[in-house]
Amino acid sequence: MEEIVLLFAIVSLARSDQICIGYHANNSTKQVDTIMEKNVTVTHAQDILEKTHNGKLCSLNGVKPLILRDCSVAGWLLGNPMCDEFLNVPEWSYIVEKDNPVNGLCYPGDFNDYEELKHLLSCTKHFEKIRIIPRDSWPNHEASLGVSSACPYNGRSSFFRNVVWLIKKDNAYPTIKRSYNNTNKEDLLILWGIHHPNDAAEQTKLYQNPTTYVSVGTSTLNQRSIPKIATRPKLNGQSGRMEFFWTILKPSDTINFESNGNFIAPEYAYKIVKKGDSAIMKSGLEYGNCNTKCQTPIGAINSSMPFHNIHPLTIGECPKYVKSDRLVLATGLRNTPQRKRKKRGLFGAIAGFIEGGWQGMVDGWYGYHHSNEQGSGYAADKESTQKAIDGITNKVNSIIDKMNTQFEAVGKEFNNLERRIENLNKILEDGFLDVWTYNAELLVLMENERTLDFHEANVKSLYDKVRLQLKDNARELGNGCFEFYHKCDNECMESIRNGTYNYPQYSEEARLNREEISGIKLESMGIYQILSIYSTVASSLALAIMIAGLSFWMCSNGSLQCRICI
């Protein structure tokens, strides 16, 4: 009779109403790394490393780049005849120059402080070309005979369009004294040069005077150059060389030129009408008729991600370059569906006791599952889910905002005398990239650890919220579930979910059921103890009889000798 009562109580207990706290799970296979674990499968994750580009040169914020094609910056500014398409250019967002453009200094020579000039262009977005000394204003010198086969145009000898190579006239080269006052409101970029002949014969043939100079002065510049006559190997068919110079003439300042030979005079200058962040980018790509906020030499990036690994040289509002191959930020929970439980991580299952997630709960990250006489079902806790979503979204957006940098570094150029500085600069830049990469990877690992811990804490908080309401009206099953000692219909379940559960209303029913179950357990324990003692005694007696019978049989057939000594 007692066994029947116990069985009935156990069956009744198994059918008691229950409410469980759990979390969302899905079919996601996305994995993230944390400080302590690798390849943790999560329900949701966000890739924050951009790896793709469009392979094109694009306008930057609606402004086209100045793509110099086969011309160099020097060829463009001096006016190489093969660069006539760039005689007048509109505003640019950045300048594109090939690695080794063929149309540079057609007449061989050097461009003094060329790298500094390029640096100036990285802060300039528009030039306006103006004439400062007309070509026909040199009555005592030949202004049209200064041409060379090294700078051909339509099969004939020509010269740079924006400067004038002055030659002697009527076997005389009178000393030049010419000034220009900058009456503009903008700074002026002025270029000039000096010719270094191959020998003395060429010197007198072109300039008559055997000893010459070129002197240039402004309020900040005082320069005097003397031609260097020397025998040199031919380049572009020329043994002579030309050296070009530049300066910035401020408004109201005056530039003075004085020379008695070898002078390459400016005809045009460049008014700097718009300054701003620009750059000279080395690339062989063509314009792709597109628009972007971030450009690299190998293509444009259109991404809101905070990091990229496409190219270290960029211009615009770009993600931060890192050397990483993978940066994935966890936004969801550990993905451990109940049907396929996985190995516990460092901190065990979520909240320490809930072993599996619910794929049936699709409208929230955390929630409840109940079962009673009216049925069963899932219900998400939308308040805690929304708070978690807002917190993680704000965190991701904060990371993106902090990492987005405007007009990121573009490669610097150094002349031949600065190679050691260039090498040091590369070492420093590589070091900075290594540090940024390490910081980015560490940031992701730490944030992923915090996110997963954050979700676990939210589940635990939801569990504690239910536990504190139910008190002793239900018992904890140890798997995230509570078993009621009273009937709990759907209205009762809803009151628990919204935090309005009326403990006193159900406490008496719960107490009676709890005491009844406890009494049955105690009675069943007494029965089990009697049965246990009876079983032990009976087993021992049977074993003793078996041993005695075996001994008697062995003595009777002589297999065992029995002696009784008194």
From Swiss-Prot:
Which Gene3D superfamilies does the record associate with it? 3.90.20.10, 3.90.209.20, Hemagglutinin Chain A, Domain 2
Tell me which parts of the chain lie in the Cytoplasmic compartment. Answer: 551-566
Q: What disulfide bonds does the UniProt entry report for this chain?
A: 20-481, 58-290, 71-83, 106-151, 294-318, 488-492
Kindly list the residues that the UniProt entry marks as S-palmitoyl cysteine lipid attachment points. Answer: 555, 562, 565
Q: Positions of the site: Cleavage?
A: 344-345
Q: Which GO molecular-function terms appear in the entry?
A: host cell surface receptor binding
Just give the chief location class.
virion
One GO cellular component term of this record is: virion membrane
The record's note on quaternary structure and interaction partners says: Homotrimer of disulfide-linked HA1-HA2.
- Protein's recorded name: Hemagglutinin
